[in-house]
């Protein structure tokens, strides 16, 4: 074997092209590159739901490093652990996990600074392009950014903590901006160098890239005199280490680095035939991608990009992309203050960076970018308002879909196309992730979310239920299990399967500490709705009275239990702060107590007005995901609490389900939700009429020439949200069934209405962040549409 390696080293005849680099640095360079590959492998273990294996790998390598006696730092290991803990923290939002991530990422910041100084001091050139220490500027920016996000997302952070987080964000922004400019300036050099390395690799007959050893070049043959035995032995060792690093990178890119079988060829368009009315998508996609690079040549490109350069590029793109998107989501009042000091975000630029990273990078940065995109587009909170779409640009009408398979570069025109219809591209990348990481339910959860966003609720719940029903499947990461169970519970609620929904919400008590009171309140609301379904005869039961008593008892049990889990309420004294939905449920229960005093002889379930679960469904974007059948059932159930003979009420003088008079405040909530349901069924004009006559007119007293409104407090989120939803009604009416579409006029009219929503929604109120993000998303989307015309 040694003889073979000697021969290989002789053939390659490695020699330095940079005389100012000390020879003993080459061992250190390869040691660092190997550390980076180890760190990337550890983070891949997390992506495959094998976090313990990843953590043990990092601990083992850190111990070996400390025992080696080397003065060379290993600053990548703390970052790898910090990234893993960051992902766990942001999946579950549990205080103790977030605090642990905060500590580790702070250590990673310090380690990165120290490693950067070391590389500069000893001129450790780990890149052909960037000066020594650049990679640890990136790890510093990454740890600073993730640390700032953890600090911002902690539920019990105060003003001081928030200020510290924003300061960290700004520091990360400055570092990333500096490195990003270097990357853009060096792009021609990088491409030229990649071509050169590929050419050298082909000519050396061994197809081993020397990209990880800056300062060396390969010659096709050795000189007739050969070299000294000492230099030859050194070359053999370098070649041995170089080959190990190459194989590590190769395994990571091909998906075999975790011991999993190499993923089979993935059909990126599988399922599109069923989910789109346009059957030509697959064939047209094949046409549109005929000139793209093949997977083999794409993999070849990846293998000849050094691990460090790959990390720098993907890390900067990911972090800068996240930063730009996060800053674009910050409410306008804070955003204006930050922009004064040159600190502002651009959502479109940020999303393009995330897409580019997710498509071209097979490492933690690529998969984290994909997760960000999936949460942004298909997550439970509406960060982007895809409802503002131009006629003819709907997903079902797009005939020319790009294939993302094997792409190592993405052009600006391709990114623009992807941003117009993101739902056609996230499933492609998700298929790849599921193939590379078959053991992680996180990717299955994301697939369920994508299916739900496409209106395939039944498929989504079947996928998620069958996974947990299979005893051979294990979910090691508790945060992922909690997310899967919560989302599945919401999807069941969207389908009016209230038994399964309530079961999932109650189960969350044992696996997640986010907001146990809210979980129980949701379960109680589901049991209440099942009670109403039985009362209205919408489900067949053998013994109606027995079933009514059963669901009444369950609803009362969990309504009474829910507030006992709310922090700092009653006897539950704790350092935790109440979350927005904790305040929501406490307000709802206060309303019930007031009605109990008003109607002392009525049963608890008869004191409740508008459907609580339907109100909660709105916050999780349920009406955009329901089928026509589910929407029609929602209309019937919402009518349960309506005043006798009122519009869209199920109650009349001869037959009535409700036992209490419907207050104006409760009627406003009911009509608001019914208007949204009507719009989702295609009855846009009717829905807008309901919204204006029964909701907005109750607090808007003047529209022209000056907008005036009365401040109402019964349901704080409702008043700005109703005006926000009116914006969507206006857009649909102005852009549908018109012979001559005036996009600019439609945008302006919609923005005028949105401005009124912002005026009504000024200040801090219950669920203000959620409402504010929706309005910000709508405003950004309208700006985008306006600039295009």
Curated annotation (Swiss-Prot):
> Where does this protein chiefly localize?
cytoplasm
Q: Write out the GO cellular component annotations.
A: cytosol; mitochondrial outer membrane; nucleus
Q: Which superkingdom heads the taxonomic lineage of this protein's source?
A: Eukaryota
Q: Does the keyword Nucleus apply?
A: yes
Q: Which terms are listed as keywords in the entry? A: Cytoplasm, Nucleus, Phosphoprotein
InterPro entries this protein is in? Iml2/TPR_39, TPR-like_helical_dom_sf
Gene3D superfamilies from the UniProt entry: Tetratricopeptide repeat domain
Query: Locations of Low complexity compositional bias?
Result: 218-231
Subcellular localization(s) per the UniProt record: Cytoplasm; Nucleus
Q: Entry's Pfam families?
A: Iml2-TPR_39
Q: Where is this region: Disordered?
A: 209-231
The record's listing under PANTHER family reads: TETRATRICOPEPTIDE REPEAT PROTEIN 39 FAMILY MEMBER, TETRATRICOPEPTIDE REPEAT PROTEIN 39C
The subunit structure is: Interacts with lipid droplet proteins.
- Which family, according to UniProt? Belongs to the IML2 family.
Query: What role does it play?
Result: Inclusion body (IB) resident protein that interacts strongly with lipid droplet (LD) proteins. Involved in LD-mediated IB clearing after protein folding stress, probably by enabling access to the IBs of an LD-stored soluble sterol derivative that acts as a chaperone in inclusion clearing.
Output this protein's name: Inclusion body clearance protein IML2
Gene of origin?
IML2
């Amino acid at each position: 074997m040694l003889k073979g390696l000697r021969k290989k080293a002789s053939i390659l005849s490695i020699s330095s092209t940079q005389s100012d680099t000390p020879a003993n640095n080459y061992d250190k360079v390869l040691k660092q590159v190997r550390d980076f590959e180890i760190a990337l492998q550890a983070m891949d273990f997390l992506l495959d739901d094998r976090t313990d294996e990843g953590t043990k790998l990092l601990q083992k390598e850190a111990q070996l490093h400390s025992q080696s006696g080397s003065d060379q730092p290993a600053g990548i290991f703390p970052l790898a652990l910090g990234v893993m803990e960051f992902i766990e923290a942001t999946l579950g939002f549990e205080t103790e996990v977030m605090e642990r991530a905060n500590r580790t990422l702070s250590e990673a910041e310090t380690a990165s600074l120290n490693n950067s100084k070391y590389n500069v001091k000893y001129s450790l050139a780990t890149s052909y392009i960037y000066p020594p220490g650049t990679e640890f500027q990136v790890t510093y920016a990454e740890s600073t950014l993730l640390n700032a996000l953890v600090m911002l997302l902690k539920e019990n952070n105060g003003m001081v903590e928030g200020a510290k987080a924003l300061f960290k964000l700004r520091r990360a922004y400055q570092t990333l901006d500096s490195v990003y400019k270097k990357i853009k300036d060096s792009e021609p050099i990088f491409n030229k160098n990649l071509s050169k390395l590929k050419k050298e690799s082909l000519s050396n007959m061994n197809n081993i890239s020397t990209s990880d050893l800056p300062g060396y070049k390969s010659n096709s043959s050795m000189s007739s005199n050969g070299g000294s035995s000492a230099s030859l032995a050194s070359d053999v060792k370098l070649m041995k280490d170089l080959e190990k690093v190459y194989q590590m990178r190769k395994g990571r890119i091909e998906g075999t680095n975790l011991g999993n079988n190499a993923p089979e060829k993935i059909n990126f368009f599988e399922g599109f035939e069923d989910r789109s009315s346009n059957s030509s998508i697959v064939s047209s996609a094949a046409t549109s991608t005929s000139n793209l690079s093949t997977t083999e040549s794409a993999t070849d490109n990846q293998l000849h990009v050094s691990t460090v350069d790959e990390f720098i590029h993907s890390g900067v793109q990911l972090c800068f992309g996240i930063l730009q998107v996060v800053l674009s989501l910050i409410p306008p009042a804070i955003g204006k203050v930050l922009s004064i000091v040159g600190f502002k975000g651009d959502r479109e630029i940020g999303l393009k960076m995330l897409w580019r990273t997710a498509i071209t990078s097979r490492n933690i940065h690529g998969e984290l970018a994909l997760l960000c995109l999936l949460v942004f587009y298909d997550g439970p909170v509406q960060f982007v308002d895809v409802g503002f779409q131009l006629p003819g640009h709907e997903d079902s009408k797009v005939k020319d879909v790009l294939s993302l398979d094997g792409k190592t570069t993405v052009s600006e025109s391709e990114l623009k196309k992807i941003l117009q219809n993101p739902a056609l591209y996230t499933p492609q990348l998700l298929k790849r992730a599921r193939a590379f990481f078959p053991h992680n339910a996180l990717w299955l959860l994301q697939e369920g979310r994508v299916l739900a966003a496409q209106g395939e609720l039944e498929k989504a719940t079947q996928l998620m239920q069958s996974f947990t029903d299979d005893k051979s499947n294990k979910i090691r990461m508790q945060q992922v299990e909690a997310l899967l169970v919560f989302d599945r519970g919401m999807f069941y609620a969207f389908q009016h399967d209230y038994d399964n929904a309530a079961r999932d919400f109650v189960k969350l008590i044992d696996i997640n500490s986010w907001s146990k009171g809210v979980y129980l309140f949701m379960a109680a609301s589901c049991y209440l709705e099942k009670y109403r379904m039985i009362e209205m005869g919408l489900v067949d039961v053998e013994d109606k009275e027995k079933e009514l008593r059963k669901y009444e008892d369950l609803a009362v049990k969990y309504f009474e239990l829910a507030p006992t889990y709310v922090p700092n309420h009653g006897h539950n004294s704790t350092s935790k702060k109440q979350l927005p939905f904790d305040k929501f449920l406490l307000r709802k229960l206060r309303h019930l107590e007031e009605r109990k005093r008003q109607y002392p002889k009525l049963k608890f379930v008869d004191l409740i007005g508008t459907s609580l679960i339907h109100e909660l469904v709105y916050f999780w974007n349920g009406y955009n995901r329901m089928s026509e059948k589910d929407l029609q059932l929602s209309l019937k159930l919402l009518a349960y609490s309506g005043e006798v003979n009122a519009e869209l009420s199920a109650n009349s003088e001869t037959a009535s389900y409700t036992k209490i008079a419907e207050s104006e405040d409760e009627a406003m909530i009911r009509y608001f939700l019914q208007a949204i349901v009507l719009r989702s069924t295609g009855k846009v004009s009717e829905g807008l009429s309901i919204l204006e006559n029964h909701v907005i007119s109750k607090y808007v007293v003047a529209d022209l020439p000056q907008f005036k409104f009365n401040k109402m407090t019964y349901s704080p989120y409702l008043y700005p949200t109703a005006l926000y939803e009116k914006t969507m009604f206006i857009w649909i009416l102005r852009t549908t069934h018109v012979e001559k579409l005036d996009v600019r006029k439609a945008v302006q009219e919609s923005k005028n209405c949105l401005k009124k929503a912002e005026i009504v929604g000024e200040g801090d109120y219950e669920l203000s962040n959620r409402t504010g993000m929706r309005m910000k998303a709508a405003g950004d989307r309208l700006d985008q549409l306006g600039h295009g015309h």
